Amino acid sequence: MDVEKTVSETIKKYKLAKKSDNVVVALSGGKDSTSVIYIMKKLGYDVQGLLIDLGLGEWSKIHNEKMKKFCGENDIPLTIVDLKKELGQGICFIKAVLKKQKNLTGCTVCGIIKRWILNKWAKKLGADKLVTGHNLDDEAQNVLMNFLKGNVLLGVNSSPSTGGREVRGFAQRIKPLFFCAESEIMKYARSKKFDILYEKCPCAFGTYRVDTREWMAGISDLEKKKIVENFQKLVPKLRAGSGRELVVCKKCGEPSSSELCNFCKIISNI
Ligand code: AMP
Ligand code: ZN
Protein backbone atom coordinates (compact mmCIF):
# COMPACT_ATOMS: atom_id res chain seq x y z
CA MET A 1 0.00 0.00 0.00
CA ASP A 2 1.16 3.49 -0.87
CA VAL A 3 0.12 5.57 2.15
CA GLU A 4 0.53 8.96 0.43
CA LYS A 5 -1.57 7.84 -2.54
CA THR A 6 -4.31 6.36 -0.32
CA VAL A 7 -4.50 9.60 1.69
CA SER A 8 -4.71 11.71 -1.46
CA GLU A 9 -7.43 9.46 -2.93
CA THR A 10 -9.45 9.42 0.31
CA ILE A 11 -9.34 13.23 0.51
CA LYS A 12 -10.53 13.52 -3.10
CA LYS A 13 -13.18 10.78 -3.00
CA TYR A 14 -14.79 12.03 0.22
CA LYS A 15 -14.10 15.73 -0.46
CA LEU A 16 -12.38 15.98 2.93
CA ALA A 17 -10.56 19.29 2.40
CA LYS A 18 -9.90 22.13 -0.01
CA LYS A 19 -6.53 23.79 -0.54
CA SER A 20 -8.06 27.03 0.79
CA ASP A 21 -9.17 25.38 4.09
CA ASN A 22 -7.50 26.15 7.40
CA VAL A 23 -6.67 22.57 8.40
CA VAL A 24 -5.91 21.92 12.08
CA VAL A 25 -4.31 18.54 12.74
CA ALA A 26 -4.70 16.96 16.19
CA LEU A 27 -1.15 15.87 16.97
CA SER A 28 -0.65 13.22 19.64
CA GLY A 29 3.04 12.91 18.80
CA GLY A 30 2.53 9.36 17.52
CA LYS A 31 3.18 7.88 14.06
CA ASP A 32 -0.38 8.35 12.73
CA SER A 33 -0.93 12.04 13.36
CA THR A 34 2.71 12.86 12.49
CA SER A 35 2.37 11.03 9.15
CA VAL A 36 -0.96 12.63 8.27
CA ILE A 37 0.23 16.21 8.92
CA TYR A 38 3.41 15.55 6.95
CA ILE A 39 1.49 14.09 3.98
CA MET A 40 -1.16 16.83 3.93
CA LYS A 41 1.55 19.51 4.03
CA LYS A 42 3.33 17.74 1.16
CA LEU A 43 0.06 17.63 -0.81
CA GLY A 44 -0.20 21.41 -0.48
CA TYR A 45 -2.79 21.83 2.29
CA ASP A 46 -2.59 24.72 4.75
CA VAL A 47 -1.93 22.74 7.95
CA GLN A 48 -1.18 23.59 11.56
CA GLY A 49 -0.73 21.29 14.56
CA LEU A 50 -2.72 21.20 17.80
CA LEU A 51 -1.35 19.13 20.67
CA ILE A 52 -2.95 18.60 24.08
CA ASP A 53 -0.34 18.29 26.81
CA LEU A 54 -1.94 15.58 28.97
CA GLY A 55 0.63 16.08 31.72
CA LEU A 56 1.69 12.42 31.78
CA GLY A 57 5.18 13.03 33.17
CA GLU A 58 8.18 12.23 30.98
CA TRP A 59 5.94 10.70 28.28
CA SER A 60 4.20 14.03 27.60
CA LYS A 61 7.41 16.04 27.97
CA ILE A 62 9.14 13.98 25.29
CA HIS A 63 6.12 14.18 22.95
CA ASN A 64 5.95 17.96 23.33
CA GLU A 65 9.65 18.46 22.64
CA LYS A 66 9.66 16.10 19.66
CA MET A 67 6.57 17.74 18.12
CA LYS A 68 8.05 21.23 18.61
CA LYS A 69 11.16 20.07 16.78
CA PHE A 70 9.22 18.27 14.03
CA CYS A 71 6.89 21.22 13.36
CA GLY A 72 9.83 23.67 13.44
CA GLU A 73 11.77 21.62 10.89
CA ASN A 74 8.74 21.27 8.61
CA ASP A 75 7.59 24.88 8.86
CA ILE A 76 4.28 23.95 10.52
CA PRO A 77 2.70 26.22 13.17
CA LEU A 78 2.01 24.37 16.44
CA THR A 79 -0.31 25.16 19.36
CA ILE A 80 0.15 23.26 22.63
CA VAL A 81 -2.80 23.28 25.04
CA ASP A 82 -2.20 22.44 28.70
CA LEU A 83 -4.99 20.11 29.81
CA LYS A 84 -4.54 21.00 33.48
CA LYS A 85 -5.01 24.70 32.74
CA GLU A 86 -8.07 23.94 30.62
CA LEU A 87 -9.84 21.74 33.17
CA GLY A 88 -8.25 22.72 36.48
CA GLN A 89 -7.30 19.05 37.05
CA GLY A 90 -4.83 16.59 35.59
CA ILE A 91 -6.05 13.68 33.46
CA CYS A 92 -5.00 11.05 36.03
CA PHE A 93 -7.11 12.65 38.76
CA ILE A 94 -10.14 12.91 36.48
CA LYS A 95 -9.76 9.30 35.37
CA ALA A 96 -9.43 8.04 38.94
CA VAL A 97 -12.58 9.90 40.05
CA LEU A 98 -14.64 8.73 37.10
CA LYS A 99 -13.46 5.16 37.52
CA LYS A 100 -14.79 5.25 41.07
CA GLN A 101 -17.95 7.26 40.38
CA LYS A 102 -19.11 5.77 37.09
CA ASN A 103 -16.81 2.83 36.45
CA LEU A 104 -15.64 4.40 33.20
CA THR A 105 -12.37 3.13 31.74
CA GLY A 106 -9.40 5.41 31.22
CA CYS A 107 -9.44 5.40 27.41
CA THR A 108 -13.15 6.29 27.26
CA VAL A 109 -12.63 9.26 29.57
CA CYS A 110 -9.46 10.39 27.82
CA GLY A 111 -11.19 10.13 24.42
CA ILE A 112 -14.20 12.23 25.49
CA ILE A 113 -12.02 14.90 27.10
CA LYS A 114 -9.57 15.08 24.18
CA ARG A 115 -12.41 15.37 21.66
CA TRP A 116 -14.01 18.23 23.62
CA ILE A 117 -10.76 20.21 23.98
CA LEU A 118 -9.83 19.62 20.33
CA ASN A 119 -13.24 20.89 19.11
CA LYS A 120 -13.01 23.95 21.32
CA TRP A 121 -9.48 24.83 20.22
CA ALA A 122 -10.07 24.05 16.57
CA LYS A 123 -12.81 26.68 16.68
CA LYS A 124 -10.48 29.14 18.45
CA LEU A 125 -7.88 28.61 15.73
CA GLY A 126 -10.49 29.26 13.03
CA ALA A 127 -10.25 25.74 11.64
CA ASP A 128 -12.36 24.66 8.69
CA LYS A 129 -11.29 21.06 9.23
CA LEU A 130 -10.00 19.15 12.25
CA VAL A 131 -7.88 16.15 11.25
CA THR A 132 -7.28 13.14 13.49
CA GLY A 133 -4.91 10.26 12.86
CA HIS A 134 -7.49 7.46 13.20
CA ASN A 135 -6.55 4.61 10.87
CA LEU A 136 -8.04 1.48 9.28
CA ASP A 137 -7.25 -0.68 12.32
CA ASP A 138 -9.04 1.77 14.65
CA GLU A 139 -12.09 1.69 12.38
CA ALA A 140 -12.12 -2.11 12.03
CA GLN A 141 -11.87 -2.36 15.84
CA ASN A 142 -14.85 0.00 16.16
CA VAL A 143 -16.97 -2.15 13.87
CA LEU A 144 -16.19 -5.27 15.89
CA MET A 145 -16.54 -3.59 19.30
CA ASN A 146 -19.92 -2.09 18.44
CA PHE A 147 -21.14 -5.43 17.13
CA LEU A 148 -19.97 -7.28 20.25
CA LYS A 149 -21.63 -4.66 22.45
CA GLY A 150 -24.84 -5.50 20.59
CA ASN A 151 -25.14 -1.90 19.41
CA VAL A 152 -24.21 -1.57 15.77
CA LEU A 153 -25.91 1.85 15.78
CA LEU A 154 -22.91 3.24 17.69
CA GLY A 155 -21.18 3.22 14.31
CA VAL A 156 -23.72 5.53 12.73
CA ASN A 157 -21.16 8.35 12.43
CA SER A 158 -18.38 6.14 11.11
CA SER A 159 -16.96 7.91 8.07
CA PRO A 160 -13.77 9.56 6.84
CA SER A 161 -15.63 12.79 7.66
CA THR A 162 -17.51 12.66 10.93
CA GLY A 163 -21.22 12.98 10.49
CA GLY A 164 -20.57 12.70 6.78
CA ARG A 165 -21.43 16.35 6.28
CA GLU A 166 -20.62 19.86 7.46
CA VAL A 167 -22.25 21.30 10.59
CA ARG A 168 -22.35 25.09 10.65
CA GLY A 169 -20.10 26.74 13.25
CA PHE A 170 -18.00 23.62 13.89
CA ALA A 171 -14.79 22.40 12.34
CA GLN A 172 -15.67 19.20 10.55
CA ARG A 173 -13.62 16.28 11.86
CA ILE A 174 -11.89 14.32 9.11
CA LYS A 175 -9.84 11.12 9.02
CA PRO A 176 -7.61 10.96 5.93
CA LEU A 177 -5.98 7.72 7.23
CA PHE A 178 -9.37 5.94 7.35
CA PHE A 179 -8.28 3.37 4.73
CA CYS A 180 -4.58 3.14 5.73
CA ALA A 181 -3.54 0.07 7.71
CA GLU A 182 -1.59 0.73 10.91
CA SER A 183 1.24 -1.56 9.77
CA GLU A 184 1.65 0.51 6.59
CA ILE A 185 1.65 3.80 8.49
CA MET A 186 4.29 2.38 10.82
CA LYS A 187 6.43 1.43 7.81
CA TYR A 188 5.87 4.88 6.26
CA ALA A 189 6.80 6.78 9.44
CA ARG A 190 9.94 4.67 9.91
CA SER A 191 10.95 5.09 6.26
CA LYS A 192 10.72 8.87 6.73
CA LYS A 193 12.78 8.49 9.93
CA PHE A 194 10.35 10.63 11.94
CA ASP A 195 12.00 11.34 15.28
CA ILE A 196 8.98 10.45 17.46
CA LEU A 197 7.90 7.92 20.08
CA TYR A 198 6.65 4.76 18.37
CA GLU A 199 5.22 3.12 21.51
CA LYS A 200 1.57 3.13 22.48
CA CYS A 201 0.21 5.35 25.25
CA PRO A 202 1.43 4.00 28.64
CA CYS A 203 -2.06 4.39 30.13
CA ALA A 204 -3.81 2.25 27.51
CA PHE A 205 -4.15 -1.13 29.18
CA GLY A 206 -6.96 -3.31 30.47
CA THR A 207 -9.58 -1.73 28.20
CA TYR A 208 -12.04 -3.21 25.75
CA ARG A 209 -10.20 -1.57 22.83
CA VAL A 210 -6.89 -3.09 23.88
CA ASP A 211 -8.53 -6.54 24.14
CA THR A 212 -10.17 -6.07 20.71
CA ARG A 213 -6.84 -5.08 19.18
CA GLU A 214 -5.34 -8.29 20.51
CA TRP A 215 -8.21 -10.44 19.18
CA MET A 216 -7.77 -8.86 15.77
CA ALA A 217 -4.02 -9.39 15.63
CA GLY A 218 -4.44 -12.43 13.37
CA ILE A 219 -6.63 -10.64 10.82
CA SER A 220 -4.85 -9.47 7.67
CA ASP A 221 -4.87 -5.84 6.50
CA LEU A 222 -6.94 -6.87 3.49
CA GLU A 223 -9.61 -8.41 5.74
CA LYS A 224 -9.63 -5.29 7.92
CA LYS A 225 -10.19 -3.21 4.79
CA LYS A 226 -13.11 -5.43 3.81
CA ILE A 227 -14.64 -5.10 7.30
CA VAL A 228 -14.43 -1.30 7.11
CA GLU A 229 -15.61 -1.04 3.50
CA ASN A 230 -18.54 -3.39 4.08
CA PHE A 231 -19.56 -1.43 7.15
CA GLN A 232 -19.41 1.80 5.14
CA LYS A 233 -22.09 0.32 2.86
CA LEU A 234 -24.32 -0.13 5.92
CA VAL A 235 -23.81 3.39 7.34
CA PRO A 236 -26.30 5.27 5.10
CA LYS A 237 -29.00 2.75 6.06
CA LEU A 238 -28.19 3.08 9.77
CA ARG A 239 -28.19 6.86 9.42
CA ALA A 240 -31.55 6.93 7.67
CA GLY A 241 -33.16 4.88 10.42
CA SER A 242 -31.39 6.36 13.46
CA GLY A 243 -32.98 9.79 13.66
CA ARG A 244 -29.75 10.98 15.31
CA GLU A 245 -28.85 14.55 14.47
CA LEU A 246 -25.86 16.53 15.64
CA VAL A 247 -27.04 19.36 17.92
CA VAL A 248 -25.44 21.93 20.24
CA CYS A 249 -24.83 20.95 23.88
CA LYS A 250 -27.04 23.18 26.03
CA LYS A 251 -24.32 23.57 28.66
CA CYS A 252 -21.08 24.16 26.74
CA GLY A 253 -22.21 24.85 23.17
CA GLU A 254 -20.06 22.13 21.63
CA PRO A 255 -21.40 19.58 19.11
CA SER A 256 -23.38 16.74 20.63
CA SER A 257 -25.78 13.95 19.69
CA SER A 258 -27.98 14.64 22.73
CA GLU A 259 -29.01 17.65 24.88
CA LEU A 260 -25.86 17.35 27.01
CA CYS A 261 -22.59 16.34 25.37
CA ASN A 262 -20.60 13.39 26.74
CA PHE A 263 -18.02 15.76 28.22
CA CYS A 264 -20.60 17.71 30.26
CA LYS A 265 -22.26 14.45 31.32
CA ILE A 266 -19.08 13.00 32.81
CA ILE A 267 -17.32 16.12 34.05
CA SER A 268 -20.15 17.87 35.92
CA ASN A 269 -19.50 16.20 39.30
CA ILE A 270 -15.72 16.57 39.42
P1 AMP B 1 -5.83 7.81 20.20
O1 AMP B 1 -7.21 7.92 20.71
O2 AMP B 1 -4.79 8.07 21.22
O3 AMP B 1 -5.60 6.59 19.35
O4 AMP B 1 -5.66 9.03 19.18
C1 AMP B 1 -6.44 9.18 18.03
C2 AMP B 1 -6.14 10.53 17.40
O5 AMP B 1 -6.53 11.57 18.30
C3 AMP B 1 -4.66 10.79 17.14
O6 AMP B 1 -4.25 10.26 15.91
C4 AMP B 1 -4.61 12.29 17.16
O7 AMP B 1 -5.05 12.85 15.93
C5 AMP B 1 -5.62 12.64 18.23
N1 AMP B 1 -4.94 12.79 19.56
C6 AMP B 1 -4.68 11.82 20.46
N2 AMP B 1 -4.02 12.32 21.53
C7 AMP B 1 -3.87 13.64 21.31
C8 AMP B 1 -3.25 14.73 22.02
N3 AMP B 1 -2.68 14.55 23.22
N4 AMP B 1 -3.28 15.97 21.47
C9 AMP B 1 -3.87 16.17 20.27
N5 AMP B 1 -4.45 15.20 19.55
C10 AMP B 1 -4.46 13.95 20.04
ZN1 ZN C 1 -21.25 20.07 26.72
What are these regions (language model features)?
Residues 234-243:
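Long, charged amphipathic helices and adjacent flexible linkers at domain junctions
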Residues 215-234:
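An accessory alpha-helical subdomain
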Residues 245, 257:
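Short metal-coordination and nucleic-acid-contact micro-motifs, chiefly zinc-binding Cys/His arrays
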Residues 1-157, 182-191, 261:
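ATP-dependent adenylation/nucleotidyltransferase module used to activate substrates
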Residues 42-43, 73-74, 124-125, 218, ...:
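Alpha-helix C-cap/termination motif
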Residues 137-220:
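Catalytic subdomain that performs nucleotidyl-dependent activation
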